[in-house]
Amino acid sequence: MISVNEKGLAIIDEMLDWEEDVKIESKVLENGATIIDCGVNVEGGYDAGMYLSRLCLADLAEISYTKVDLEGLAVPAIQIATDHPTIACMASQYAGWRIAVGDYFGMGSGPARGLGLKPKELYEEIGYKDEADAAVLVMESDKLPTEEIVEYIAKHCSVEPQNVFIAVAPTSSIAGSVQISARVVETGIHKLESIGYDINKIKSGFGVAPIAPIVGDDTKCMGSTNDCIIYCGETYYTVEDGNAEELEDFVKKAPSSTSRDFGKPFYTTFKEAGFDFFKVDAGMFAPAKITINDLKSKKSFTSGRINPGILLESFGIKNV
């Protein structure tokens, strides 16, 4: 079976070899753990964002930069293609580990989740558990983790602290923005899973999403980065299903436009909800447009729509 952490460790080695070139900085903590700053106290950039995206997906996807057109304005975008959608996106990339220790908080994603089984139910559903001596984690946080955080992660992953490798970037950084848009395929798979679809039927995934500019603090950037997927993210999946009628119904329910909160920038929705995630419709976290091709029935279905106007409003780009 593929080890996402072994693949992640190979990427870490590459990052350490090229850290000056890609504007990142590593340090080894007293307990031996390696922390790689990709945007907290360093500049980072598109190269750092690409490395974070590769880490999150455990190098089980082809990732490239491209552009999308937003009402005549070309903006940077990221394109993902994978033949290992459940392992790459759900066993690794999905930000399913909420790490809160003392006054430190960060969302954990990437290979280490496959050791800690975060969350356990998901790994049981897809039938995956990694076995590796090293844990590789990507943290979305504005602070670098301490020895205490490393000990917590090492314990949950059953590895020694010196075998913990963590790459970190805040949402309000170029690298952070890139790796969030790189979740476009994963976001669609997660939405399909949440409405009851058997994601083990998904055999490949492809997606494109714009990359948000830095619009403010982490909370505001969380809004614009989510909007990239919600309003302009496009995904295409190949499945082995066979029940075309049922599949058509799932495709209808999958896009973000089915959410009651759809239609305005996410930051506005979040603010109106008193910055309480539990008051925001979870169904909103989905790509704008989803297409599925079924290899068994030979049928294809598409649903959703692109909304560049809302994304431009979220970006706040002034035409001068």
From Swiss-Prot:
UniProt-listed CDD domains: MCH
What role does this protein play?
Answer: Catalyzes the hydrolysis of methenyl-H(4)MPT(+) to 5-formyl-H(4)MPT.
User: What are its GO cellular component terms?
Assistant: cytoplasm
Q: Does the keyword Transmembrane apply?
A: no
Q: Which family does it belong to?
A: Belongs to the MCH family.
Source organism per entry reads Methanococcoides burtonii (strain DSM 6242 / NBRC 107633 / OCM 468 / ACE-M)
Q: What is its EC number?
A: 3.5.4.27
Recorded protein name is Methenyltetrahydromethanopterin cyclohydrolase
Task: Specify the superkingdom.
Answer: Archaea
Q: Which reaction does it catalyse?
A: 5,10-methenyl-5,6,7,8-tetrahydromethanopterin + H2O = N(5)-formyl-5,6,7,8-tetrahydromethanopterin + H(+)
Where found in the cell?
Cytoplasm
Single GO molecular function: methenyltetrahydromethanopterin cyclohydrolase activity
Keywords in UniProt for this one? Cytoplasm, Hydrolase, One-carbon metabolism
Q: What class of enzyme is it?
A: hydrolase
Predominant subcellular localization, coarse grouping = cytoplasm
Q: Give the record's GO biological process terms.
A: methanogenesis, from carbon dioxide; one-carbon metabolic process
User: Which InterPro entries does the entry mention?
Assistant: METHMP_CycHdrlase
